[in-house]
From Swiss-Prot:
Start-end of Basic and acidic residues biased regions: 165-181
Single GO biological process annotation from the record: peptidoglycan turnover
Annotated ranges, domain LysM: 26-69, 78-121
Protein name: Cell wall-binding protein YocH
Gene3D superfamilies, alphabetized: LysM domain (3.10.350.10), RlpA-like domain (2.40.40.10)
Species this chain originates from: Bacillus subtilis (strain 168)
Induction summary: Positively regulated by WalR. Expressed primarily during exponential growth, with levels decreasing rapidly at the beginning of the stationary phase.
Gene field: yocH
Molecular function in Gene Ontology: hydrolase activity, hydrolyzing O-glycosyl compounds
Biased composition (Polar residues): 182-193
Signal peptide: 1-25
Renumbered residue ranges of the record's region Disordered: 130-193
PROSITE patterns per the UniProt record, alphabetical: LYSM
Amino acid sequence: MKKTIMSFVAVAALSTTAFGAHASAKEITVQKGDTLWGISQKNGVNLKDLKEWNKLTSDKIIAGEKLTISSEETTTTGQYTIKAGDTLSKIAQKFGTTVNNLKVWNNLSSDMIYAGSTLSVKGQATAANTATENAQTNAPQAAPKQEAVQKEQPKQEAVQQQPKQETKAEAETSVNTEEKAVQSNTNNQEASKELTVTATAYTANDGGISGVTATGIDLNKNPNAKVIAVDPNVIPLGSKVYVEGYGEATAADTGGAIKGNKIDVFVPSKSDASNWGVKTVSVKVLN
């Protein structure tokens, strides 16, 4: 009887959204210490969308101001904005279609997708969680859950199945050891994106800046942090990256002059920044 009622709710939800967009919006008040990126992650929305909804031209926000958060998932055109953690399998299941259909509709040659991009889904999402639960129960062949928007790799699955075989480098928790492990194994990792950029360097107090990154990292308190400033339209904020000559870092900051294929690497001192100068380097986006 319970399953019958749950199915009826799912069907009713589908019928109300079959010919229109299913959307809702809410308004939040910016709190002291909030960042635009942090708000986007907390509410599960894309940073670029958040700026468009509120007509923002920069990442600067002020405590006390109001921001509109829209949870719109699809439009009448059947477009869906990919979120961090999405996979083609998840999206196909969410919209009642197949991975193959999504690839055909969007001219995809692989399962690789990127957060912030849009996909044609040719339908609407169900409004009832019970419908999703039933679909998962009836579709055991669905692809396994992934933690990031990236192509599934057999080698990674093998590591997950054999946790006792972790290398010493993977078990170390110190920043220096992790950096060495990344440098020695980067060539064996499959990056989700690789590009050539112009790289300059900056310190925590260049040009009178506060020393706090766009994602809330206090560089004055973390002088050895591996952080780079990026154009979020090229490298998403929060991404783990490997920068040639710098090592593994987090794309945690932005800058007015950082546009397109250009990055700024954070270094502890002015002398380090001067020694770095201007370089052309390769950047691998690891997730």
